[in-house]
Regions:
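N-terminal membrane-targeting hydrophobic helices
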Residues: 1-198
Length: 198
């Protein structure tokens, strides 16, 4: 598999390549005015890069990717335990990135609810941030459907860049094996990362 640095370069390069392509579609095909077309392009490309760098399909491994989350890597431990590596749930083009986004949303909501409950146990009352967050997300998606769609498409393309690179290497190795050329490698060390004891 490509290492983490290669995946990052693929994400950045494909994100940069998307800018003129998406802007052209927004202005010519969808006939959006300049400010709206540029905003939607930036939402799509920003989500592409965010997805590729922070919400990578390799979050199901103890790798350099989850270290980018710093101390918040613990948020992804349950995901690692449940989702097998290179499985449909981690490396598909549409379902996997949306699953990671939904998982992250549910974890944040759960932490907000748990925090409010914990503070209520010691007599502190806090606003219902979980409900407020859900309402704000609903309001934003209802008010800005084009930007929401651009974000979701970009989130999927960022993950797809990673997944397609992995698939290409796997298929390339199979092709070489069919020719009698053996390439040895282990996906657990594909990003040259040595797991820390946590």
């Amino acid at each position: 598999m490509p290492n983490a640095r290669t995946h990052d370069l693929i994400t950045i390069a494909s994100g940069a390549a998307l800018v003129p392509f998406v802007y052209n579609i927004a202005t010519n095909t969808l006939a959006q005015p300049y400010p709206e077309a540029m905003a939607n392009t930036l939402w799509l490309v920003g989500a592409h890069i965010l997805s590729g760098l922070l919400f990578s399909p390799d979050l199901d491994l103890d790798s350099a990717i989850d270290n980018r989350w710093g101390v918040l890597y613990v948020l992804w431990r349950p995901y690692m335990w449940v989702v097998p590596h290179r499985h449909f749930w981690s490396h598909s083009l549409i379902v996997a990135p949306l699953l990671r986004l939904a998982y992250f949303y549910l974890v944040i909501i759960g932490l907000l609810l748990l925090g409010a409950w914990g503070l209520a146990q010691i007599g502190l009352v806090v606003p219902d941030y979980a409900t407020e967050l859900a309402q704000r997300i609903r309001a934003i998606t209802a008010a800005e459907p084009a930007k929401t769609l651009a974000f979701l498409i970009g989130f999927c393309t960022g993950s797809a860049a990673h997944t397609i690179a992995d698939w290409s290497v796997t298929r390339g190795k199979r092709f070489l094996r069919a020719l009698g050329i053996t390439i040895r490698g282990d996906y657990r060390t594909h990003d040259r990362y040595i797991p820390r004891r946590r």
